[in-house]
Amino acid sequence: SCDLLPSDKPTFRHYMGDVFDFIDGDWDLAIFHPPCTDLAISGAAHFKEKIKDGRQQRAIEFVERLYNCDIPRICIENPVGVLSTKSKLGKPTQYVQPYEYGHYETKKTGLWLRGLDPLKPTDIKDLTGLPKKVTQRLHYLPPSPDRWKIRSTTYKGIAQAMAEQWG
């Protein structure tokens, strides 16, 4: 893994720093989870400000640079937002939902793929009759210092499917 933040779990396989300082290597696959703060539709109320001060454009250019790096197989993961309409990436190759991978929740997430087959669902859950507080848990999280981190966590079932199908 690579992030500007330290890993939540002790590991010797975590590079803390700028991904572009580390990306030039002998990689055959990269699964990128770029920050969605300035891109996701959940922050649409703040888009005007983010466009005006350049944050949104910088975020788009960061993602485009990741996608165009010299790695043969790439996945860019990001929730529904402006990448599909304002970036050179266009629409995602596919959208995935946590309930397709063993979780009783919804969070429509785009995958922009290069050199990879679309991810196949592994364990589709029926959400019929479940309350929104369960299926849309992330929307109901109370304010907290870690709310952003909880909302951005990759679902284990999706990560496992990526590892098994692409790894």
Positions of PLM-derived features:
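Conserved active-site and SAM-binding loop architecture
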Residues: 1-167
